[in-house]
Amino acid sequence: MRYGKVILAVALATAALVASATAQQPKHVLRFSSPVSKDHAWGRGAEKFKQLVADATKGQVEVQVFHANALGAIREGLEMVRLGTLDFQLSGVAHVSRFVPEMGTLVLPYLWKDTETMFAALDGRMGQTLEPLLLDKGFKLVGWWDNGFRHVSNNKRPVRTPDDIRGLKLRTLPTKVHVAFFRALGVSPTPMDWAEVYPALQQGVVDGQENPPGIVYFEKLAEVQKFYSLTKHVNEPGNVLMSRAVFTKLPGDLQAAIMGAAKEATRWERAVSQKDNDELLKKIAAAGMQVNDVPEATLAEFRKVAQKIYAEAAADLGAKGKELIDLGVALNK
């Protein structure tokens, strides 16, 4: 009799352990691809999102973050998200314009006067206009993340005037408006995926590139670039995009939990990114790059060049694109 009670107790304890272990295992494992290092604001934001999702779903959903293009280049990642074979891709909006051309309006040179205006637009009417266009192409918009104003780096000379940039071969964003802007400045624009940029700079395939301080510092571009000129020509936000196919298969409570976590992670990432970009210029200089301001009078010359391509962009992007451009211009007056 006593022996039977012992057996029963052991069986019950074993069942409890198995049930506990099963309860702790996530029901859904989602992969999140980030193109940058884990130290960049995007990388830290991705880790924050991972933790917030785990908390909000009580462990039912696990987000696995893969940094520094570990799952492949951005372009392939976006295609996989559309197909439902990858759950999340973090990307600058320029790459997304390959699928949703109207996204290219967000990287018109000298469109945004400041970051606050940009996010007010994206959290408001501009974002509401773009979100269904993304959804139609298979992307569930999870958040607009900050990256900061882009500036030009190169190995030839400091850029203080339009004459200084003429003749440089620069890696640029893969959008028509971005390429047209640099071509109008006399640059040889060379779009390429971010995964290819460091070796291209190292081998002299291109003279330079253009990115915010967070990218320049955390991606260690001081190892392969000499000059960093604060041209402030584009403020390109990031997109956290989830596969529409994956999102719609999740129960409603988990969908709500993920979007709630995304909202909190977005607020957190924006604050971190803006703090980084304010502080990192000194670290970039300490790492060996020569950092120079561009005089306001010179920035006005760059803006004049930029204005020439707005009409071309509006014609290329159709009625919806023109509506977005007009809205962006009006918001930045």
Regions found by a protein language model. Name each.
Residues 1-5:
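Positively charged n-region of N-terminal signal peptides that target proteins for export
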Residues 17-23:
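Sec/Tat signal peptide C-region and signal peptidase I cleavage site
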